[in-house]
Regions:
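Beta1-alpha1 glycine-rich phosphate/pyrophosphate-binding loop at the start
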Residues: 15-86, 178-203
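Flexible, glycine-rich terminal cap/loop adjacent to redox cofactors
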Residues: 16, 20-24, 28-39, 47-48, ...
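A Rossmann-like FAD-binding core segment of flavoenzymes
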Residues: 39-43, 84-109, 116, 183-284
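Rossmann-like dinucleotide-binding cores of NAD(P)H-dependent redox enzymes
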Residues: 72-73, 163-165, 171-230, 315-318, ...
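Short hydrophobic core segments
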Residues: 116-126, 250-259, 323, 401
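Glycine-rich dinucleotide-binding loop and its adjacent helix/turn
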Residues: 123-183, 221, 276-277, 282-284
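FAD-site-proximal beta/loop scaffold in flavoenzymes
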Residues: 138-159, 233, 237-242, 248-328, ...
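A conserved FAD-binding loop/helix module that cradles the flavin
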Residues: 282, 296-358, 446-463
Length: 465
């Protein structure tokens, strides 16, 4: 009997993954998806002119810590193309059609609109600056800071100016205050609240402002409880600023640091659920309310572990982890993003400001009975060189003793104390359990009794159990 050779032709289906956005979460998702599915068709669309960059590093580029902005770039479009990830710059997603598994894209260079199909869609379209309603806010030389181009333009302006105005005293405003002072500019920072850095408890915010004012040396002025009502200028740019109390002063340029808002419009229009924070609602697998559609990064709300509540906290560190989780699950895997603790840190001149978990005010709003202790201690043994103070606030629940949050401010090593507390919050430790920690000690690094243990020892006396 003759041998019969059956030739079987197998059609290999290749998954088509479409990613919208490409700064942190989107770029991370693309890289992870490619590693997991070497044969998948992956397309990344962004309205930006760059992808995969550290926007958090922009204030330090403006400050002059490094001259080449390209150091902020992590992976170039060309590098992605070598891995067969197709990057479409200046192409904006304008509509998601989930019933057809399509996205309407507009090429911003040609204005051509076209449809792309997907098997899995990952939304990572980030956030955008909030532009306050101020008269003449659209004058030239009034900036926001979000993208690479913003940083380049602000730095170029700073190098030919003598005075800068910052509107907003949050993280970006405070970081730019340092940047402009280091560039030898006179700076005016205007904040509508009674203190800068209002994500901290009021007592710590006041401490931050007091310490900043103490090192001003007439290089900068912080105006609190003030609003900007009008900018004046001409076609060449802004020339002066007017406040609600009638103060008027000249300036060369302005940076608006008045917060951000998540980009959710196309998701909402597609029927994707938003969360209580107004950002896109996702589960621990980064799945949205629509099948085969995932979301990650600054456009999504997150699970705040310590209180089992929701928060919108746009940070690059979280975005990268979320992008990884979204990609794993979109590729058929099983990964969960545990949530966030609300950990953050920044610096202004010689002052470090760091926090994790809940503030005392937020804890009370969520139904806890918070108690706290604040201590000011050396960050290392007093006879060592470069010793500095840190003020540490530790917060726990009165009834259970559970640690809820911590804040640290000072010229000393505040950030490493907060990192230790973040680990404790993740583990659900009580203040008594944390006090049992065997923290490192040597004179160049910490006092015999670390400020963390000193604060927790005092706080143990304030809790019920």
């Amino acid at each position: 009997m003759a041998n019969v050779i059956n030739q079987v032709f197998i059609y290999i289906w290749c998954m088509k993954i479409v990613i919208l956005g490409g700064v942190a979460a989107g770029a991370k998702a693309a890289a992870k998806a490619r590693r997991l599915l070497p044969d998948a068709e992956i397309d990344l669309y962004t309205d930006d002119t760059h992808i995969s960059y550290s926007s958090c590093g922009l204030p330090y580029y403006i400050e002059g810590n490094f001259e080449d902005y390209r150091l902020l770039l992590v992976v170039s479009p060309e590098e992605f193309e070598k891995k067969n990830v197709h990057v479409h710059l200046k192409n904006r997603a304008v509509k998601i059609i989930p019933e057809a598994k399509q996205v309407l894209i507009q090429d911003l260079s040609t204005q051509r609109a076209y449809l792309v199909d997907y098997d899995k869609l990952i939304i990572a379209i980030g956030a955008r600056p909030i532009i306050p309603k101020i008269k003449n806010v659209n004058l030239p030389n009034i900036f926001t800071l979000r993208k690479i181009e913003d940083g380049i333009a602000i730095k170029e302006m700073a190098l030919k100016s003598t005075h800068a105005t910052i509107v907003g005293g949050g993280y970006i405003g405070i970081e730019l205050l340092e940047a402009f002072v280091k560039q030898n500019l006179k700076v005016t920072l205007i904040e509508y609240s009674s203190c800068v850095m209002t994500t901290f408890d009021e007592d710590m915010s006041k401490l931050i402002q007091e310490q900043l004012n103490s090192i001003s040396n007439n290089r900068f002025k912080i105006m609190t409880s003030e609003i900007v009502t009008e900018f004046s200028g001409d076609i060449d740019g802004v020339k002066s600023v007017k406040t609600g109390t009638g103060k008027v002063f000249d300036t060369d340029f302005v940076v608006l640091c008045t917060g951000a808002t998540p980009n959710v419009e196309i998701a909402k229009d597609a029927g994707i659920d938003l969360g209580v924070t107004g950002a896109i609602k996702v589960n621990e697998k980064m799945e949205t309310s629509i099948k085969d559609v995932y979301a990650c990064g600054d456009c999504v709300e997150e699970h705040l572990v310590v209180s089992n509540s929701k928060i919108w906290l746009p940070l690059g560190s979280n975005a990268n982890k979320e992008g990884r989780t979204a990609a794993i699950n979109a590729c058929g895997g099983d990964d969960k993003f545990f949530g966030v603790l609300g950990s953050s840190v920044t610096r202004c001149l010689n002052l470090t400001m760091s926090m994790t978990g809940l503030t005392e005010k937020r804890a009370a709003m969520l139904g806890y009975t918070p108690v706290s202790v604040t201590v000011t201690k050396n960050d290392k043994v007093g006879y060592m060189p470069n010793v500095n103070n840190i003020t540490l606030k530790l917060i726990a629940d009165y009834n259970t003793g559970k640690l809820l949050g911590a804040q640290a401010v000072g010229a000393g090593d505040a950030d490493k104390r907060i990192n230790a507390l973040a680990a404790a919050l993740l583990g659900g430790m009580t203040v008594g359990e944390f006090y049992k920690n065997d923290l490192t000690y040597a004179p160049p690094f910490s006092p015999t009794i670390d400020p963390l243990l000193n604060a927790s020892q005092i706080l143990m006396n304030k809790v019920k159990t």
